[in-house]
Amino acid sequence: PLYDKVKRKHISQMTYFDYKNEVIITPKEWLEKAREKKLFYFWFAWQGMINFDFLKKIKLKFIDGIFAEDCHFGVLLFALSKNIYIFPKQICIYRLRELSSMNFTNKKWIIHPNSHLKKIDVFENSNTTRLYYESASWMQIALDFIKFIDSNHYLSEDIKTHFLPVVCNKALTLKKLDKDPLCLKKCTKNLKIYIQNQPLGAVDRVKEYLSYKLAKELSRKKGILRLTLPFSVIRVSLQHQKDTIEYKKSIKRNVLNKRLPLEFYRDYQQALSLKNQKLIQSLHGIGLKIMSLKG
């Protein structure tokens, strides 16, 4: 992608899939590669060509008005294909605009007066509105994946066990929100079955965050021991920075060393609750500043 007023290092999907030569693969091979590389999100829209006669035949369309519609479209397109031709050379540029709703790097999020998103603009906080929009989008993707799974396609079970759990976990965030303008919260009860076999691990991952470590250190220092807090913060921050550097080196050695996303785990929602505790949130910014100073 070409980032318009957005600073972001980008690693393409092709890098993770590690296709270096032209090759024709089957949908089963594509899915096995995604599983091997631990890729739980797959998207496809601008980065390839499609036989439109085939597209009309399978009656696949983008879901209107959602976030990450290319994830839904890409997974089902590749699953329903007969063959997939891989051309590993990058020959087109995707421009990512600063205020686009599809700008996944975007910190600033504005709903324009004529936007289709005005119907969900019922929250008092733009960040909450954005969270609802994304969660509701993942819900619609999850429901369409489930419809595909119920069609008894030969890849149904693979989609169910590999791509669906992370989507369901993202959609279940709807339960935390007090308003539901699209009336999708009622569907959350149907999703839990698809994450029940996932391992635990998200809460433990959050406990590795610098903000959590600082919060824990702060809670341990009582009375006169508070005087030693600055030294403890520096010690914890330096050790965290060292661990982070080692982790980044391990990824460079082998991309498979990259940690699984939090939403892969069954306890994702509990991890979000821990992550969003006020003390941990307030220390997150402090932790980032410390890391930038030490870096």
Functional labels for PLM-detected ranges:
Residues 95-225, 230-233, 251, 256-295:
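C-terminal subregions of glycosyltransferases and related glycan-biosynthesis enzymes
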Residues 228-244:
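Flexible linker/loop signature enriched in Pro/Ser/Thr and Pro/Gly
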Residues 245-246, 251:
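Membrane-proximal transmembrane or re-entrant/amphipathic helices at the cytosolic face
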Residues 12, 58, 90, 190, ...:
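A general marker of short, structured functional hotspots
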Residues 1-88, 92-131:
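Donor-binding/catalytic cores of nucleotide-activated saccharide
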Residues 15-18, 93, 211, 239, ...:
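Intrinsically disordered, low-complexity N-terminal regions enriched in serine/proline/glycine
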